[in-house]
Each structure stands twice: as C-alpha cells, then as structure tokens.
C-alpha cells in the first residue's frame, strides 16, 4: 500500500524534484497537458525521482470543451499514465467526468464560472464513481481581488458538498516551477482555515489513495475492482 503525502504539479526537472523532497513531500504526480504529452519527459522525471529516492507518478490533464474529444483522449491516455485529470468549468464536462470511473480527478470545476461548478447531484456522482474534486492552490494564489474571493467561495462550497456526500477531494500546489512549490504544511494550514482539521488530513492523504487504487487495477491478476485471479 502506498503511503505518504503526494503533490500534484507540473514539475519535471531535477531541481524541482529535489525541492519537492526538501519541502517534505513523499512523492509527486507530474502532470502534462494531453496535447503536449511526451513519454520521454515523464520517463526522465521518474529517473530524477529514483535518483533522489522520491516517488514520481505520471499524470495527464485533458483540457477540452468537446465531450467526444474528451472521451477519445480518456481512452487514449488511461493506460499510459497513473493519474488522469480532466479540466472542468463547463457544466456538461463537469457532469460527464463525474459519471466516468475512468477519470481520477475533476480539476477546477469552478474554472471561469460564476458559481462553484457542482451541486448535490454531481457530488453524488463523484462519490459513486470515485472521481475526486481538485482544489488547485496555485490557481487561487495567482488570482486577484474578486476572482480570488470567488475561487475561495467555490472551494468552501465544494468542500461542504464533498463532505456531505463523501466525494473524494484532493488539493494540489499546481506548481510549474520551484517558485510555485509549497510545503505540505502550507496546504494543510490553508485547508484548516476553510474546513475542520480532521477533514483536512483526509484530503491531504487522498492523492496517495487514488494512486494506490490505480496501481492495484494495473495488476495482471486484477480483472476489475473486487475481481482478482487467485492462483492455487
């Protein structure tokens, strides 16, 4: 079983990997955009991780408002990477993603919206299909004034829904360079300001549980969740 606190970011260089470890992370999901995917880049990032005794997992974020294109990309990348994210914002995309158990994380459901991008129906779908909701801390930090308060409100609203319906939640630094990297304690401290400490702890541990689940499904002996070939 995978243990530890794992960040989700866009860090692929050796200095970034060293910084993540120094800041206290146990591992990292290195996320590429689906239209820029490079197996060579992720392989080199994994090698940097191995060199510095740091776990690196592969991720792809699919960004499109076209459902057919999104579903084709999901089929294309599901078996190529450890973690699959889809950028939200469009309400139809939000709903479709939460209906699909092939996706791990709905990223930024509030993106470019006047509301939080979720309701009780969508939260239940996420719970049923094990699709996590992402709180992107980097997006919050980059925003200003009204936009920042709007994102913060969306975070709080989505946390209430997720907690009520037991929908998984992850928090990410979303860092793309060493200057965007935050320590686990910083993200945990932020969560403590918008929800209770026990729930904050659960959120911090969710990314590693998602990875553990996907690694389990990749085993040759596992046909699907709960169905495994046992050799006598």
UniProtKB/Swiss-Prot annotation:
It is an enzyme of class 3 (hydrolase). The keyword Nuclease applies. InterPro entries: Pol/histidinol_Pase-like (IPR016195), RNase_P_comp-3_arc (IPR023539), RNase_P_p30 (IPR002738). Pfam families: RNase_P_p30 (PF01876). One of its GO terms (biological process) is tRNA 5'-leader removal. It catalyses: Endonucleolytic cleavage of RNA, removing 5'-extranucleotides from tRNA precursor. Its main location: cytoplasm. It is found in: Cytoplasm. GO terms for molecular function: ribonuclease P activity. Keywords: Cytoplasm, Endonuclease, Hydrolase, Nuclease, tRNA processing. Its EC number is 3.1.26.5. GO terms for cellular component: cytoplasm; ribonuclease P complex. Signal peptide: none annotated. Consists of a catalytic RNA component and at least 4-5 protein subunits. Part of ribonuclease P, a protein complex that generates mature tRNA molecules by cleaving their 5'-ends. Belongs to the eukaryotic/archaeal RNase P protein component 3 family. This is Ribonuclease P protein component 3. The gene is rnp3.
